[in-house]
């Protein structure tokens, strides 16, 4: 009887385990089918309203269409290339349209939420400038491991406005110009690193990853600018801070779906993210504490770094909270201090992330274009000879003595802006709202012109990469023509269109750090382009790998 009872108990235990598991699985499947049906119906409703969309299936949505569209791209190609593929193939994808549609509704559920991508700069201005939609939940979700969403990018409303106002002085032209000697020192190291890799006596050096070099430069510059500390990443002295930052970024997921959820929920990933955050916090907290101690001693002294501004803003916020609560007990103070540190670390981390990742990519594309277009490179070198003097290796000393010379390089700035048009970083993602509609701009063709285009339940994506290659707005968009940014006559076909250039987004939530990017890129050109010849060597790189 006892043995029989034990076997019955085991069977009963298994049954008790499997039954609720089966119920949970059934509920999840029912929820997934229900969600999928709702998403697919959402797109069918667009068709019923007469809004042109790509060929859509109630079973696969746009998965088959998008799959074919991106099949020619490398497996690790950035998602931005999808919008370029849509623009390039619009006649096949939208046979009912007479011109490229201003927006494309995309249904790739369950891999991504429903999206509407703006392919037209005038449409993008509607949700970033005329009315600034809130950031997409996914954009906040991806930052959480790095910032706990205590950062300017994740904030909304009054809190965002207060922080934007507090931090803006740190990115003003005056502040950034005052830091030119510091940044020159880091960019000078960039030139020295490239020199160490160059060949001798007119020979080519060994092949290397230029993106690695620009990434290390961007890390050194951003940390020097924000913390006033030299990291020497360019010389291979990888710090715990930079290792933790880059490892965290490599483990970020914008969309969590059936293709990556195992990796996303992997306990090792979460342990590494926790450990990386502790490393970042432990490294940055002393800098925050030093500034706080200095502020307590003398509040009249204003610092020059981002940390200074963050601490000053948090100190003012803390003082205001004390006045409002009239509660100065020790427990409350300790609690505020913990929040203080979390907010400070969150703000710093988001700027470290945004400041190096996009800048490194910008510099890599910039130098590639320069050496693809020798006539542009020749004009650039000529401008540098004229303004900075004929000694290419002495340009750093010239700029230390007279930083304002950087403002006398109009062609250099035009080259940068055209490079950022030609190869554009990721556009802003916003969250659609009930009652907010995009409106098809004049001339956008049947089905779009003047029509209300719903955003509720959609991620609204500024497809600036595609918009920058819109032949309706940009004359000769497939050509690299820096001269277009020197033209002042609005009647000239090359004149940049209003709202057309969106590399830093536009509107109240445009990139707060754009002046720093301008400075770093102009310095990189000023100190490098006359010193080296550079070419792509993919075959040699493949052999080396």
Task: Label the model's feature ranges.
Residues 49-51, 173-177, 297, 403-410, ...:
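Conserved, non-catalytic sequence blocks in retroelement Pol enzymes and Pol-derived host proteins
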Residues 136-144, 178-363, 379, 384:
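Cytochrome P450 heme-thiolate monooxygenase catalytic core
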Residues 71, 76-95, 99, 397-449:
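Conserved cytochrome P450 K-helix E-x-x-R motif and the immediately C-terminal K′/meander segment
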Residues 374-376, 497, 514-545:
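Cytochrome P450 heme-binding "Cys pocket" and the immediately downstream C-terminal segment
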Residues 180, 184, 204, 240-247, ...:
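Cytochrome P450 I-helix active-site segment
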Residues 2-148, 153, 158, 162, ...:
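N-terminal membrane-proximal hinge/A-helix region immediately C-terminal to the signal-anchor transmembrane segment
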Residues 462-492:
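Conserved cytochrome P450 K-helix/beta-meander segment immediately N-terminal to the heme-binding cysteine loop
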Residues 343, 347-357, 362-364, 443, ...:
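C-terminal, well-structured subdomains that either form a transmembrane helix-short loop-helix hairpin
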